[in-house]
Regions:
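Conserved polymerase palm-domain catalytic core
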Residues: 1-96, 102-115, 158-189
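Polymerase palm active-site segment centered on the conserved acidic dipeptide of motif C
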Residues: 106-167, 171-174
Length: 189
């Protein structure tokens, strides 16, 4: 089984999707560039419609509309295909712009990060180095902060005092500081 897991994230995914890359994903980059004005290529038509939603800007998708989710999936699915079928990385999971890859060796994990970065650059996107890491398996099924907050002992009689709430929020704040993110505090609230 896998000995390592890669967690990777795309830098500013929606704002960094270049509208021309929609056509690249659907029709291949070389064919799209040769026929970039041909609206019979539905990738070019989607490109033009996406530009029109942003005052003819070619960089970035609007965050929020369902159409942006669909368009991002077109581009990212093309990247997934290349990773799996060209680069031969089979143990990939992706949720929107977050990649998880299971590797048998540390070298394989590093190779995946390199290949993912190359595939993203083809579409003028990049990895978020701050959120990309290789972790050794096995890992706990939950993050440490989740375990700590779930194990907090509230009174069984249902009588919760200000002191109890303060202690719980102090724990959540401490977990947020250790984790380097606000998620534990949001979870507690």
């Amino acid at each position: 089984g896998a000995q390592f897991v890669v967690k990777a994230d795309i830098t500013s995914c929606f704002p960094s999707i270049y509208t021309h890359s929609i056509s690249w994903a659907l029709h291949q980059k070389s064919k799209s560039k040769q026929n970039d004005k041909l609206l019979e290529l539905y990738g070019n038509l989607l490109d033009k419609c996406t530009q029109n939603m942003r005052d003819r800007q070619t960089n970035g998708l609007m965050i929020g509309p369902h159409s942006s989710n669909i368009i991002s999936e077109i581009v990212l699915t093309s990247i997934d295909y290349e990773l799996q079928n060209v680069k031969n990385h089979r143990k990939i999971k992706r949720h929107v712009d977050d990649y998880t890859f299971y590797a048998n060796t540390y070298d394989e994990a590093e190779r995946f990060i390199k290949d993912l970065g190359m595939c993203l650059r083809t579409y003028e996107m990049s990895l978020n180095d701050k959120k990309t890491r290789i972790l050794e398996l096995p890992r706990p099924s939950e993050e440490n902060w989740t375990l700590a907050l779930n194990r907090f002992s509230f009174p069984h009689d249902g009588h919760i005092t200000f002191s109890t709430i303060r202690s719980f929020l102090d724990l959540a704040l401490e977990c947020s500081q250790i984790a380097g993110k606000s998620t534990p505090l949001n979870y507690a609230i």
